[in-house]
From Swiss-Prot:
Pfam families: Elf-1_N, Ets. The keyword ATP-binding does not apply. Belongs to the ETS family. Its main location: nucleus. Residues 308-341, 503-518 have a biased composition (Low complexity). It comes from Homo sapiens. GO terms for molecular function: DNA-binding transcription activator activity, RNA polymerase II-specific; DNA-binding transcription factor activity, RNA polymerase II-specific; RNA polymerase II cis-regulatory region sequence-specific DNA binding; sequence-specific double-stranded DNA binding. This is ETS-related transcription factor Elf-4. Abundantly expressed in the placenta and in a variety of myeloid leukemia cell lines. Moderate levels of expression in heart, lung, spleen, thymus, peripheral blood lymphocytes, ovary and colon. Lower levels of expression in Jurkat T-cells and other T-cell lines and no expression in brain. GO terms for biological process: cell differentiation; natural killer cell proliferation; negative regulation of inflammatory response; negative regulation of interleukin-1 beta production; negative regulation of interleukin-6 production; negative regulation of tumor necrosis factor production; NK T cell proliferation; positive regulation of DNA-templated transcription. Changing residue 382 to I: No effect on transcriptional activity shown in IFNB1 promoter-driven luciferase assay. PANTHER family: ETS (PTHR11849), ETS-RELATED TRANSCRIPTION FACTOR ELF-4 (PTHR11849:SF170). The keyword Transcription applies.
Length: 663
């Protein structure tokens, strides 16, 4: 086969050595035939290959492969590569000859043909030629993919390539000059003085920090601003070095100069006088002024109050007895101020936040918010003779208890309200001491919510509640308290022999406010104080009803008694008589107190005591006798039923818990 080149009649002759046996044999370069070149009129063959146009063939064989080129680059005429279509082996041999031709210059070689990305810049890729897949060895798949791309652009000259390579080298050098950004470092020289404050200089020659920038950083650091350096007139940029020695030491650590002092730093400050950055305030020592203030300046001086406010919650969370009592007084004052602005409500809503865990009574609560109704620890002294009194609490095993202290605590949904009964001996400092003829008082206090209780027993009130609540306005101002009345739970022969009921009294600055006979206090719970002094609701008392009212009064602080003292008081003075006990199921009651005046209790009561040892199981049912024979004007609070009651409804709020507390 001969290839004729017009018009110069350049002829290529070669011998065919079984090229049509197997196509895959072309992968071996040793199989290729020898090429005989008769005439090479133009030795610079780079123009020949750079001027070839691409013809994308799907089957990988060059059919109708006319490779065009410009006339001025090769010969006077057109360079035409013809094919007689006799056999595909001739076409493959022709392409292989063109690829493997030796050139006098070192520019044309196999690598430059295959790797077109080296011949052309990355910004403008233009592959030189498209060749069949079987013409490339298997060890060069990347070169095959690069050579297989199609393009209609013409080739570029060597001058254009050289210029683009030079531009690419320049861009590469410029990229190398860019330094990697380092990680953010601490801007506080006090927390870590060894690490400098990273500031980008204006000229772009690295990162450094100047003295005036260092002083600005100190003024924006809450660790140094009030202590070592501070603003005197921030709007004018005037600041003072409170501790010049400490500031100079910090600057020395920043510059890695341990012997830095204020004199050396002062010389650097005087340098800024000439630059117009700083100025010395005349007549004042260690006072300087910034000529221009930055816009994004962090203000530290105004954050002193907020820092004190943020430090208050940790103090409140770990408050002692005194701080807890102060919090209670503050919440009481806030409640009393906001009380006359709303309307009264006879229902008590469940708290939104639960305080879980048993704590001493004096530090039961955290500070409540004004918009949430949270039962808090408050004890109210009710006395018919005095309005506002101060309490001096004294507990003695030999004294007769004239007050019964009840505590109620909501433990959230799914659990029962727990009452805590504690006898107190209260001495009035502004009035006569409590005598044995005084009526029994009920001093009530809320106990924080607890998840579990060790010992629990119940008491059933057996007062003959024949009267109903009177519609009367409570005149005593103060934090509103919910008054809950328990109905008569025992009927018929189970009524006490001395049915004289106690008197419920609310003490306040305007004088005591009493409720009519027949009212039994079940719980005093202080609300958020958003309601005014309410009017007590009236309604008939039924055997299965739970009536709630509200009274107001100034809350006092209660006192919890240890369990041993309480047991002695109950046994010696109140003539406590042990009765059969039962274990109370814990967390089995779910009271519903949201706006309901009636509460349906279980049909069978649970009665028990709290000894020091574990409760003994028993199937009997009875009541607890807590009679006080020395009290003449009031009946016994709780009486014993000699026989089991035919109908004794159980109220979840009558759960009573006795817990040992240390005074």
């Amino acid at each position: 086969m001969a290839i004729t080149l017009q018009p110069s009649d350049l002829i290529f002759e070669f011998a065919s050595n079984g090229m049509d046996d197997d196509i895959h044999q072309l992968e071996d370069p040793s199989v290729f035939p020898a090429v005989i070149v008769e005439q090479v009129p133009y030795p610079d063959l780079l123009h020949l290959y750079s001027g070839l146009e691409l013809d994308d063939v799907h089957n990988g064989i060059i059919t109708d492969g006319t490779l065009c080129m410009t006339q001025d680059q090769i010969l006077e005429g057109s360079f035409l590569l013809t094919d007689d279509n006799e056999a595909t082996s001739h076409t493959m041999s022709t392409a292989e000859v063109l690829l493997n031709m030796e050139s006098p210059s070192d520019i044309l070689d196999e690598k430059q043909i295959f790797s077109t990305s080296e011949m052309l810049p990355d910004s403008d890729p233009a592959p030189a030629v498209t060749l069949p897949n079987y013409l490339f060895p298997a060890s060069e798949p990347d070169a095959l993919n690069r050579a297989g791309d199609t393009s209609d652009q013409e080739g570029h000259s060597l001058e254009e390539k050289a210029s683009r390579e030079e531009s690419a080298k320049k861009t590469g050098k410029s990229k190398k000059r860019i330094r990697k950004t380092k990680g953010n470092r601490s801007t506080s020289p006090v927390t870590d003085p060894s690490i400098p404050i990273r500031k980008k200089s204006k000229d772009g020659k690295g990162s450094t920090i100047y003295l005036w920038e260092f002083l600005l950083a100190l003024l924006q650091d809450r660790n140094t601003c009030p202590k070592y350096i501070k603003w005197t007139q921030r709007e004018k940029g005037i600041f003072k070095l409170v501790d010049s020695k400490a500031v100079s030491k910090l600057w020395g650590k920043q510059k890695n100069k341990p012997d830095m002092n204020y004199e050396t730093m002062g010389r650097a400050l005087r340098y800024y006088y000439q630059r117009g950055i700083l100025a010395k305030v005349e007549g004042q020592r260690l006072v300087y002024q910034f000529k221009e203030m930055p816009k994004d300046l962090v203000v530290i001086e105004d954050e002193d109050e907020s820092s004190e406010a943020t430090a208050a919650p940790p103090q409140a969370s770990t408050a002692s007895v005194a701080s807890a009592s102060t919090t209670r007084r503050t919440s009481s004052r806030v409640s009393s101020r906001s009380a006359p602005q709303g309307k009264g409500s006879s229902s008590w809503e469940k708290p939104k936040i639960q305080h879980v865990g048993l704590q001493p009574s004096a530090s039961l609560e955290l500070g409540p918010s004004l918009d949430e109704e949270i039962p808090t620890t408050s004890t109210m002294l009710v006395s018919p003779a005095e309005g506002q009194v101060k309490l001096t609490k004294a507990v003695s095993a030999s004294s007769v208890p004239s007050n019964i202290h009840l505590g109620v605590a909501p433990v959230g949904s799914g659990s029962a309200l727990t009452l805590q009964t504690i006898p107190l001996t209260t001495v009035l400092t502004n009035g006569p001491p409590a005598s044995t003829t005084a009526p029994t008082q009920l001093v009530l206090q809320s106990v924080p919510a607890a998840s579990t209780f060790k010992d629990t027993f119940t008491l059933q009130a057996s007062f003959p509640l024949n009267a109903s609540f009177q519609d009367s306005q409570v005149a005593a101002p103060g934090a509103p308290l919910i008054l809950s009345g328990l109905p008569q739970l025992l009927a018929g022969a189970n009524r006490p022999t001395n049915p004289a009921p106690p008197t419920v009294t609310g003490a306040g600055p305007a004088g005591p406010s009493s409720q009519p006979p027949g009212t039994v206090i079940a719980a005093f719970i202080r609300t958020s104080g958003t309601t005014a002094a309410p009017r007590v609701k009236e309604g008939p008392l039924r055997s299965s009803s739970y009536v709630q009212g509200m009274v107001t009064g100034a809350p006092m602080e209660g006192l919890l008694v240890p369990e041993e003292t309480l047991r002695e008081l109950l046994r010696d003075q109140a003539h406590l008589q042990p009765l059969p006990t039962q274990v109370v199921s814990r967390g089995s009651h779910n009271p519903s107190l949201l706006g309901n005046q009636t509460l349906s209790p279980p049909s069978r009561p649970t009665v028990g005591l709290t000894p020091v040892a574990e409760l003994e199981l028993s199937s009997g049912s009875g009541s607890l006798l807590m009679a006080e024979p020395s009290v003449t004007t009031s009946g016994s609070l709780l009486t014993r039923s000699p026989t089991p009651a035919p109908f004794s409804p159980f109220n979840p709020t009558s759960l009573i818990k006795m817990e040992p507390h240390d005074i």
